[in-house]
Amino acid sequence: MEPISHVVKSSLPNYLSSLPIPDSFGGWFKLSFKDWLALIPPTVVVAGLGYTTYLAFCPAARCAGKDSGRCNSSIRKNEAKVVTMVDVEDIAGQAAFCRCWKTKNWPYCDGSHGEHNKQTGDNVGPVVVKKK
């Protein structure tokens, strides 16, 4: 317990008092490169604590990344796995099949990937099957 007491009562106050924090707004522009380097560690600690607090107290932040890996957002959601069988003999000349899961005409592509590509910067397109 004594080492913790020493850090809290002596080391930390000495460190914080030695930081080059200017008295005025204009003083920030007069800091040297060495002074800016000395300010990096406490800034990183404060930013880390702020981010950790944000994650702890903002429910939307905790579940923001959970749904991002899902590509199918609407097609046959009641099934465990979406599988569609199409016989090659049933294809007249060629058929374009959706790969982006945005189509309203599943499993065929209706061009919905174009809007998806514009919004996300993606480059997804259909799978085109041709009859020989």
Swiss-Prot record:
Annotated SMART domains: ZnF_CDGSH (SM00704)
Transmembrane segments: 36-58
Pfam annotation, one family: zf-CDGSH
Coiled coil recorded as keyword: no
Domain of life: Eukaryota
Residues annotated as signal peptide: none
UniProt GO BP: intracellular iron ion homeostasis; mitochondrial transport; regulation of autophagy
The protein's name in its UniProt record: CDGSH iron-sulfur domain-containing protein 2 homolog
Organism: Drosophila persimilis (Fruit fly)
